[in-house]
Amino acid sequence: MDVDRLQEALKDFEKRGKKEASSELDQFLCHVAKTGETVVQWPQFKEYFVFKLEKVMDDFRSSAPDQRGSPNPNVEYIPFDEMKQRILKIVTGFNGTPFTIQRLCELLTDPRRNYTGTDKFLRGVEKNVMVVSCVYPSSEKNSSTSLNRMNGVMFPSNSQSYTDRSNVNGPGTPRPVNRPKFSLSSPMTTNGLPDSMENNESDLQQKEKSQSDSVASEDESQATTPKNKHSAEDSAETEEHEVKRLKFDTEEEEAACANPDASSEVSTEMAEEAESASASADKDKESCQSAQAADEESLMTPSESTEADSGERDSETVSVTEESSEESHQMEESEQSETACSLNSEEQNSAAAAASTVGTDTSEEEHLGTFGVKSTETLTLSPMENSEEATDAPEEPMDQD
């Protein structure tokens, strides 16, 4: 539709003194009823729209003046003139094109298509004019889209559409979530309110996109975290064991540093044990020596008896054997004293070197004691043999005599 011709026709209608219908402007209303798009602003065709609305209501009443039957008790009865003035007042109060402009143009171009009674027609018109949202003409847009609006509902089409809505007589209606935004070629206000809110919607869409991206990344991170849950727990357990071990080592070191007296006491106790072990070893040696002496005495008794028997034979040989036995006894006693002294020195050194091995030392001493006893027995036996040999030796010359 030619916008320039439409604007000229609207200007001519305003200049006329007597308001009459125009075929060109009626075609414009039919175009809006079919497509739902207005190519001019609301203030430009507002006057002709109000004129056409009033004329259609009057013509509808003239064709059906009286209501048939009794009025509906569930519906409030409003006189025609009062309803007419109410509708005209609402329409003249609009500062922008109402989003129901397509349905209103359908009622103006073909009023008897859906209504037969005047009161029902007026109620239908009232329902479509009692709106607060508005649309902008497509001529004010920088580009067109594939969206169209019919009776406030958006649907795809190949024609230009009015996608923006602003507040006319109250708060705006809810907006779709993903709706393309277009900037106006010239700043415009509706009902005294600036249009800055409409221009800021692109920023809001960008924020919503960033928020959705962040939510998606969080979901991905949450999906990957359960996979690494067990490995994280294992590492945490190993770290706890290492910390406990380090704490135990540090506690032992602190206890050793804090109790130096206890360590010194332990050393003194060990020294005392070593001394007591050495004293017990000395006592054991003395007892061994006394036992050895008793064994020697017991062994000497048979030797003396043999000497007494030999003394009966010859007194001279007995004296010789006694002297030899005494000499042998002295030599044996000197040898035993030397061995005892050497054993005592060795035992003292071993007791001072290791106090903890007292038991082993005592066993060694017992072994040595038994060895000494055996040695003394052998020694005592050897003199007896010598004495017998000595007794046999003097007998030979006596036989010769």
From Swiss-Prot:
This is Serine/threonine-protein phosphatase 4 regulatory subunit 2. Residues 386-401 have a biased composition (Acidic residues). InterPro entries: PPP4R2. One of its GO terms (cellular component) is protein phosphatase 4 complex. Residues 139-401 are annotated as: Disordered. Serine/threonine-protein phosphatase 4 (PP4) occurs in different assemblies of the catalytic and one or more regulatory subunits. The gene is ppp4r2. Signal peptide: none annotated. It comes from the Eukaryota. Belongs to the PPP4R2 family. GO terms for molecular function: protein phosphatase regulator activity. Residues 139-149, 156-170, 183-203, 339-349, 373-385 have a biased composition (Polar residues). It comes from Xenopus tropicalis (Western clawed frog). Pfam families: PPP4R2. Regulatory subunit of serine/threonine-protein phosphatase 4 (PP4).
